[in-house]
Each structure stands twice: as C-alpha cells, then as structure tokens.
Design a protein with these regions (language model features):
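Short aromatic-glycine-(Arg/Gly/Cys) micro-motifs in beta-strand/loop hairpins
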Residues: 1-15
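Hydrophobic beta-strand residues in large extracellular and virion-surface proteins
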Residues: 4-8, 25, 29, 100
C-alpha cells in the first residue's frame, strides 16, 4: 500500500507525517513552509515572495497561492508547483529543509 511521507528538519530536529494521499502530504508540506516563512496574510505573502533575501524583487509580481481553502481545491500537480515556489524561499536558511517521499507500508 503506497503512502506519502512529509519530512522536515528544522534547527537539527526532524519530524515527519504520513499521508494516505499524495495531495495530503503536499498540503502538509505547503502549510509547514508557509508557517516557517511567517505567512499569515496577503501582505506577508507579498513581502516574503518579493523580498526574502534582503533584495526587493519586482513588487508587482503576485506570490503563489497561500490561502489554505483555495489550496485544498487544487490538484496534486498544481500543488507541487506552488510547493516548489514557496520552498525555494527557504533555501538561504540551512536550518530548514523538507521533502515529500512516496513509500510503501511493509508487512
């Protein structure tokens, strides 16, 4: 039986969650990344997406979706794209990393 695992390492501590669906794992990953980045509203999302490395980028660029209700209505394929865009904003901080893996339940 396939399952998906969301794994995260933050400040040397590891945690993981298991999910029956790929979409569930991606949603958990996006939620964790958004929490790590401190995104709670539209203003936070724009600031983080356009000014994460201390260099203000194009302020007219809209950030990827972050509203949990809207994310839940998307497909796994759409969510992977959003996850990729947000997780890229964590790459400058070597204290945080996360990954989604598919595995099987062994008997």
């Amino acid at each position: 039986m396939p399952i998906w695992v969301f794994m995260v390492r933050y400040d040397g501590e590891m945690a993981c969650s298991t999910h029956f669906t790929e979409k569930g794992a991606i949603l958990a990953a996006i939620e964790d990344v958004l929490q790590y980045l401190g995104i709670e509203d539209d203003e936070d999302a724009k600031k983080v997406y356009n000014d994460r490395s201390g260099i203000e980028e194009d302020a007219a660029v809209e950030p990827p979706e972050w509203h949990h209700e809207k994310l839940r209505k998307m497909t796994a394929g759409e969510l992977y794209g959003i996850f990729g865009e947000w997780v890229e904003k964590t790459w400058d901080d070597f204290m945080y990393e996360c990954e989604i893996l598919k595995t099987k339940v062994a008997a």
